[in-house]
Amino acid sequence: MGSKIVSDANAFVKFLKLCQDESKDNCTYMDDVSVLLVKKEQLLHDIIGEKNQPIFICEKAQTKYEPEATETSADTSDVEDVLFKVEQDPGPQPLSIMKARQLLSWYTMAHNPNMSRLKAPENLHPLWVRCDKSDPCATAWLGVEITYSGNKTSGVKLYTVCCKGPTGDETAFTTLDELKQEHQNRHHTSAVSTKGYAQYNLFCSLTEESLMFESQSSVIASLTWNHVEKMLECPPLSSKATLNIKVAVGDIRSPLYQTYREMEFLLALAGGLRTGEIEWLEPVETQSAVDLTRALIEELENLAHGVPGHSAKASEKQKAKPDAAFSSMVIERGDLDFTEQLWEKMRKSVTSYQDITECMKIVVKAVKLGKIKPWIHKDSNSTLSKLILQSYQQQIDSVPLTGLAPANMLLELGLDKIRKDFINYLVGKELTTLNYLSYYLDTEVDLQEQVVRVRKLHHLLEILGTCSTFLSLPHERLFLFTQSCLQYYKTSNYDEDHIFQLQIKPALISYFYEKEQPFSWAVEVSSGQGSKEVKTSLYLSDKPLVDHIHLDLDVSLNESVNGDSEKMFYYRTMVSCSLINFI
């Protein structure tokens, strides 16, 4: 073997080892190759499978644009052109197939124990190279990882990822028999097994007009099964199914939209107290907060004096929109006490701190003078509730109503009321117990932390609303899922982007997907076991699984314009693996 090849291979693996030891995220090799050390390349991870170690990614080094020195009187358009070029980000760029194969050959030769003049450092991460698909197979990735027999290097696995543009013509897909034959020819085996994967967006199975509204929420059903019989087959009921649920609050189709509006005011008020700045929500009521508060006090006074025609309102129910895409999920209660009714009126009408102060002064004065002795829940924890309880015994403490004290009192009312709403639903529906909710109901922590915890409960209820009303999941699944979500939010920050997972029987959700087309479908043909296992896979997806090359639409213009709009167009990604043994 030529000394030049040996020298180049040794230099390359030593460079990789240096990057690995120094944990360098991005290094440049020989001016034209960028070497990235990454913990996880998401698109690659999706098609290769679970790999829990970092990898090297080689790609074309991008030339940094450095503008030439210009006279200070340069034309403005030239300056704008320079700025445009600097700001452009072309994204990752591939290497040629020839260059990619050279890098993989250096890596492979250096690990071959039979090559006495080559010595690879120990425990080198796997290597992946972005390719420009200029070969007949349209190769987009080449990869290599080491296999071991005990502690000794026994060989390498070489991976090839080939991609083709989207098509709706199923006759253009590789058939299952062709995929099996490809695997058997490559690995000289007759015994193969197959495994299928499919993903469905269950929200897409709804046809209500309300789905015209763009939603940040999603319910993705992921199914896996063995013994695939044909391409794009519907997963059998024996599959393993997982729901991946992400719910963003504030969707007007949600049965909890009115609860969201209530939380929106609570969060705005809490934010104002925390930062000193608040953007008041548009009032729902036409009357002022002060007038509504006076009317509530007057109503209670008339009731106390037995004036005919007056009765205390038991609740201020806000029903979900009748045209919601989901069926109803009632959170509101019918037993609102005085402080809760006051909260309801004020949250819909206050537009300033002055409003809050005036309203609180009216209420406190009426309580101190004994004009009203309203009913309140015995477990109420707010300052105003305690004041009312004291009024029953004619022993009332002094309450400061200056500065931000009234706003804090209002925040307490909101927290008390919303907590009771949530307890009423979760415990009333037997989805959890007060003991499991103790973290979320703790009033010993400061008000801002109480708001954070109530906000987490609200997000949980939005998720349960999706599961119970849209998916109609049975109680036993909702109960276990509720405990899982409660446990998660005890130690995690509020996060609407978090994906909650729920294992489920396919029969419970088959109604949603059996007549739908999956947005992602894959079949895997495999043979061998352990480190000797090799796979050949085909992925069909509605989005490309590579991000560094352009994939043309594999369909005629006439078909794309006049074709069936219901037809799914799939990108095709083939992943093959070769096992090379050194010993």
Swiss-Prot record:
It holds the Pfam family Zwilch. Gene3D superfamilies: 1.10.287.1880, 1.20.58.730, 2.20.25.230, 6.10.140.520, 6.20.270.10. It is found in: Chromosome, Centromere, Kinetochore. Keywords: Cell cycle, Cell division, Centromere, Chromosome, Kinetochore, Mitosis. InterPro entries: Zwilch (IPR018630). GO terms for biological process: cell division; mitotic spindle assembly checkpoint signaling; protein localization to kinetochore. Disulfide bonds: none annotated. GO terms for cellular component: RZZ complex. It comes from the Eukaryota. Essential component of the mitotic checkpoint, which prevents cells from prematurely exiting mitosis. Required for the assembly of the dynein-dynactin and mad1-mad2 complexes onto kinetochores. Component of the RZZ complex composed of kntc1/rod, zw10 and zwilch. Belongs to the ZWILCH family. This is Protein zwilch homolog. It comes from Danio rerio. The lineage of its organism: Eukaryota, Metazoa, Chordata, Craniata, Vertebrata. The gene is zwilch.
